[in-house]
């Protein structure tokens, strides 16, 4: 049958393996030239050794400091081979840094605990808190490091050193495999050319074999004296402030008049500079819903879901015209359903709800200088107003059913408040953009409701949340600031705004083609598709549209074969012993599907739909053609059910349930999952083209014979086609639902 097309693509894929397309060889070869960026890529700090002006080679030496490390344990064995400097960026508040020792205090075991103390605070040891000793607390008169420790006859002692540096720490010197020396010194200033890290030291044994060092905050490691580097890091480097005037913002948000737009160069050397940007922005949120109509008699709607929206707009910032691009997406949406079970009952299979604690993500990018070279960024801050949606005509939709007043789905009020700002990357039809993601949380809604007609008619359902919007746009304003590491020479840029890849271009072509493809797929006659599905389709049938493609048949075949190798269907078929039956994955892992002259399976329908539609579209691009073939194999008819027949018992499994029933009486029986899994690996698995509910409805309505029931259970193609030709509404509705899932 038609699915033999996929079998041929699998069995003859050797053709593309030995026939690589020349264009691939031209476009896939990459030569990488790069500059060693020093330890910035490791430590999120400036490069280790600065250059001295214009030079013609790398200005950076081997990294001396690594980090920040976030692991919670340092193994003892990693500290006994060489001197190790354990460094911390000065915390904002008092915090526990590390501890070596058992989980609870034991006077017979040596231990130590390191804290950072903020000036004006009292620090109390966690490890030693259970003992009665005044040394377990410390009143900090200045920023400091405090080492609480016990060893031998010393019940509890503490060592305190000043911590005035931006980055500082302690020195750990190994003695042998079971002992090490902790060294500390007051870090007050950088007046000297060198620094003695060992003004105070104490030798500690290991508490117990197997006890390591617990870390409670991120840290850096150095294997050689980092004093010179830390001294250079400490020097003030503010050099240039570029200030621009900004228009006054007349808005009801909490931001008031807003700050001046500032670009502040805070550090600079031969190749790199750190620039702090502060900008006011105008943010737009566009919420758009997508409505999918089901098959049948016109009363069935499959879903109403919120779409991920790409939206562009322009505004003026400090006299400069700014072109902005945002991507709006959603998280933690709720799902609702509505409707009855009869074919003429209006129903919505699923509609999304934005309710309290749902999230709206807005990824923002504009064409101003702040997003040029936006690769390494730190200290991202934002102060953004919220969004308010109130009822409008764009927040109602009327379902055009065949008979009666059109039911309406309505939304009321929605309030979004700003939650936080993150770095992100958004993908458009043409480019990938490094962006700022603004996270908004839903804090209140006035509810959704369904009416029998216009908004003033009777309500038939209601609930909390925001259910529908037809592209309504809301505005807010705010400020953003961040520090970006960029080249000192402004001519260097990263390919962000102008990037365009083959894959993105292909996605754009697919998007342009999607509506036409889906419209043709919806208009096809059921009997035509079933007749085509019952015919022995081959690769030559697929290439009937090749004359419209500006490539040779040989190149088209190679492209299709190569693309097909990436599909899940091909990868699973390549595993000869693959018999895994995964219930939670919509049964996609069933490979031993029944094959005989009369039995119809899902691949028969999907390949017939793909061949029919592509031939009618007359596609002129070989990449798009290959992409559609591969997508049809994996994505068409995602909602699949399978069954097996054992004597007079049918075992059936769907995406939502599993059950067994008698083939004559259709009475359900207990389902044995172990037995079913064993049968799935040994017996042919039948695609449930006509589902159990439809078979039962046909028997109850028309009183068909046991022989016809058996043929429907076995997905007998001639029997199904005869019901279609007789215009049986139940069978037509079922097949229409399957065909409606054959969409790009």
From Swiss-Prot:
Keyword Cytoplasm tagged: no
GO cellular component, one term: viral outer capsid
Coiled-coil residues: 503-523
Gene3D superfamilies xrefs: 1.20.5.170
UniProt KW Membrane keyword: yes
Keyword set, alphabetical order: Capsid protein, Coiled coil, Hemagglutinin, Host cell membrane, Host endoplasmic reticulum, Host membrane, Host-virus interaction, Membrane, Outer capsid protein, Viral attachment to host cell, Viral penetration into host cytoplasm, Viral penetration via permeabilization of host membrane, Virion, Virus entry into host cell
A family per Pfam: VP4_helical
Annotated spans, Hydrophobic: 396-413
UniProt cross-references to InterPro entries, sorted A to Z: Rota_A_VP4, Rota_VP4_MID, Rota_VP4_MID_sf, VP4_helical
Superkingdom assignment: Viruses
Listed GO biological process terms: permeabilization of host organelle membrane involved in viral entry into host cell; virion attachment to host cell
Site (Cleavage): 231-232, 247-248
Family to which the UniProt record says this protein belongs: Belongs to the rotavirus VP4 family.
Name assigned to this protein: Outer capsid protein VP4
Organism listed in the record: Rotavirus C (isolate RVC/Human/United Kingdom/Bristol/1989)
């Amino acid at each position: 049958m038609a699915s033999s097309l996929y079998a041929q693509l699998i069995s003859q894929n050797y053709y593309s393996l030995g026939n690589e397309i020349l264009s691939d060889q031209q476009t896939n070869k990459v030569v990488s030239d790069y500059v060693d960026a020093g330890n910035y890529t490791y430590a999120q700090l400036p490069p280790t050794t600065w250059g001295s002006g214009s030079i013609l080679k790398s200005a950076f030496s081997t990294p001396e400091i690594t980090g920040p490390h976030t692991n919670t344990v340092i193994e003892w064995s990693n500290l006994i081979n060489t001197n190790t400097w354990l460094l911390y960026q000065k915390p904002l508040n008092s915090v526990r840094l590390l501890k070596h020792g058992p989980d609870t205090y034991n006077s017979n075991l040596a231990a130590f605990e390191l804290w950072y103390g903020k000036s004006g605070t009292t620090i109390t040891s966690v490890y030693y808190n259970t003992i009665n000793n005044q040394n377990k607390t410390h009143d900090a008169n200045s920023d400091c490091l405090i080492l609480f420790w016990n060893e031998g006859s010393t019940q509890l002692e503490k060592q305190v050193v000043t911590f005035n540096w931006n980055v500082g720490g302690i020195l750990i010197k190994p003695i042998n495999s079971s002992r090490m020396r902790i060294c500390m010194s007051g870090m007050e200033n950088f007046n000297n050319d060198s620094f003695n890290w060992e003004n105070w030291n104490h030798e500690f044994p290991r508490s117990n074999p197997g006890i390591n060092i617990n870390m409670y905050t991120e840290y850096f490691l150095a294997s050689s004296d980092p004093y010179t580097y830390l001294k250079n890091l400490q020097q003030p480097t503010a050099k240039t402030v570029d200030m621009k005037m900004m228009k006054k913002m007349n808005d009801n948000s909490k931001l008031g008049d807003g700050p001046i737009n500032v670009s502040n160069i805070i550090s600079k050397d031969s190749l790199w500079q750190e620039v702090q940007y502060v900008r006011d922005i105008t943010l737009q949120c566009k919420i758009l819903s997508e409505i999918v109509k089901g098959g049948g008699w016109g009363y069935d709607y499959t879903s109403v879901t919120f779409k991920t929206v790409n939206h562009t707009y322009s505004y003026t910032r400090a006299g400069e015209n700014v072109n902005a691009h945002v991507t709006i997406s959603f998280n933690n949406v709720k799902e609702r359903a509505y409707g009855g079970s009869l074919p003429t009952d209006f129903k919505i299979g699923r509609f999304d709800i934005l309710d309290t604690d749902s999230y709206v993500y807005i990824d923002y990018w504009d064409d101003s200088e702040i997003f040029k070279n936006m690769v390494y960024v730190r200290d991202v801050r934002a102060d953004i107003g919220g969004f308010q949606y109130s009822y409008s005509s764009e927040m109602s939709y009327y379902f055009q059913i065949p008979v009666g007043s059109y039911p309406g789905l309505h939304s009321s009020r929605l309030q979004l408040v700003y939650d936080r700002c993150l770095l992100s990357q958004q993908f458009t039809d043409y480019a990938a953009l490094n962006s700022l993601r603004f996270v908004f949380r839903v804090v209140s809604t006035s509810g959704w409701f369904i009416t029998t007609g216009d908004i003033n008619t009777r309500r038939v359902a209601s609930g909390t949340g925001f259910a529908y919007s037809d592209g309504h746009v809301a505005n807010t304003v705010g400020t953003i600031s961040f520090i970006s590491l960029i080249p000192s020479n402004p001519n260097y840029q990263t390919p962000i705004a102008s990037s365009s890849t083959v894959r993105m271009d292909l996605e754009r072509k697919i998007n342009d083609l999607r509506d036409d493809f889906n419209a043709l797929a919806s208009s096809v006659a059921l009997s035509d598709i079933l007749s085509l599905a019952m015919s022995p389709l081959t690769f030559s049938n697929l290439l009937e549209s090749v004359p419209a493609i500006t490539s040779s048949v040989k190149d088209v075949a190679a492209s299709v074969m190569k693309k097909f190798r990436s599909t899940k269907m091909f990868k699973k078929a390549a595993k000869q012993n693959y018999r895994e039956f995964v219930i939670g994955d919509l049964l996609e892992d069933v490979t031993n599907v029944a094959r005989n002259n009369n039995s119809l399976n899902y691949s028969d329908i999907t390949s017939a739909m793909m061949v029919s539609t592509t031939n009618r579209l007359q596609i002129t691009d070989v990449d798009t053609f290959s992409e559609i073939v591969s997508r049809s194999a994996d994505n068409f008819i995602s909602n699949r059910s399978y069954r097996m027949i054992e004597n007079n018992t049918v075992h059936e499994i769907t995406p939502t349930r599993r059950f067994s029933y008698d083939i004559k009486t259709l009475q359900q029986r207990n389902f044995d999952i172990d037995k079913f899994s064993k049968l799935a690996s040994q017996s042919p698995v039948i695609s449930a083209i006509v589902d159990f509910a439809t078979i039962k409805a046909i028997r109850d309505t028309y009183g068909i014979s046991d022989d016809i029931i058996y043929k429907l259970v076995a997905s007998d193609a001639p029997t199904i086609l005869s019901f279609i030709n007789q215009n049986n509404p139940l069978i037509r509705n079922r097949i229409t639902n399957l065909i409606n899932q054959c969409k790009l």
